[in-house]
Design a protein with these regions (language model features):
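Long, charge-rich, low-complexity alpha-helical segments
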Residues: 1-149, 200, 205-283
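Low-complexity, glycine/alanine/valine/leucine- and proline-rich hydrophobic stretches
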Residues: 159-220
Length: 283
């Protein structure tokens, strides 16, 4: 019986609103969960109080999402509410942690926004960008006193946990931070390295094609440095000559200075050689 009561309360909280004056709707709600007798009487008697509970829970959930993606919610305006309501009804959150709520909402909403002409195309990228900032901010930064280890071509490169490589179709990272802004982003393919600095700030580095390909190999594919260099050069249609190797070394040195690169990974491949990061500008 406890399970039936919990299911009824979940529907009341997350499903379509039932008016306290709609006796047939209340009766149908109780019948759906096979509640009768003293339980039905108690729930009916306390229905107005349960409606207040519904309002508080939904307000907390709405507020948690709005705090994470405020500019997205502001740009949607009143149109956000139907998406929020449908999320709670069709794919209610399974977690007790509010930090996991927005990723669940976006997993539900983004495919639907893609097919909704009333939602601006760039909004999915903006929502992902805002949510990513909160995610990265919650992860550990590099200790301030850490000294990056020398790199080796036959081994991979180790990054801090608070590092993400993302691709957008719109330059949403250049939009103003003000929630009231309605400036439109430029439509452009963008690759960003997002990381938490030793000063505990979330920072962004926009990458060119070669740098993006190199970091994709190192971060996403966990390739050895030599293999990642070869792959990145091919993808960027550039010769892997001394000039490109210098650009790569400068990029890796810059990432070490920024606090996102820790040094070589413990994974070893076949050939042995070494590449030491040197200071300079990123590729």
């Amino acid at each position: 019986m406890q399970a039936a009561i919990e299911a009824a309360l979940a529907e009341l909280t997350l499903g379509p609103e039932i008016s306290p004056d709609d006796a047939p709707a209340i009766a149908s709600w109780l019948a759906r969960h096979e509640l009768s007798g003293a339980d039905a009487v108690a729930l009916t008697r306390d229905f107005a109080r349960l409606q207040l509970y519904r309002k508080l829970v939904r307000g907390n959930l709405h507020g948690a999402i709005e705090a994470t993606i405020p500019r997205t919610v502001a740009r949607l305006g009143a149109a956000f509410t139907p998406h929020f309501d449908e999320f709670l009804r069709a794919s209610p959150p399974r977690t007790h942690y509010l930090r996991d709520l927005t990723p669940s909402f976006l997993q539900f909403a983004l495919p639907r926004w893609a097919g909704d002409a009333s939602v601006p195309e760039y909004l999915a990228d903006l929502a992902r960008h805002e949510a990513l900032q909160v995610e990265v901010a919650s992860l550990l930064a590099r200790p301030a006193q850490h000294v990056p280890a020398e790199l080796s071509l036959e081994q991979g490169v180790e990054f801090i946990d608070a590092t993400r490589l993302v691709h957008y179709s719109w330059a949403v990272h250049r939009l103003p931070e003000a929630e009231a802004s309605r400036e439109l982003p430029e439509q452009a393919a963008v690759c960003l390295l997002v990381y938490r600095s030793p000063e505990h700030e979330v920072r962004y580095l926009e990458l060119g094609p070669f740098a993006a390909a190199l970091l994709a190999g190192l971060l996403s594919q966990r390739l050895g440095l030599q293999v990642a260099l070869n792959q990145a050069a091919q993808l960027a249609a550039l010769p892997l000559d001394d000039e490109l190797l210098t650009r790569a070394a400068l990029l890796l040195a810059d990432l070490a200075e920024r606090g996102t690169l820790l040094g070589k990974s413990p994974q070893v491949t076949e050939k042995t050689s070494k590449l030491s990061p040197q200071t300079g500008n990123p590729a």
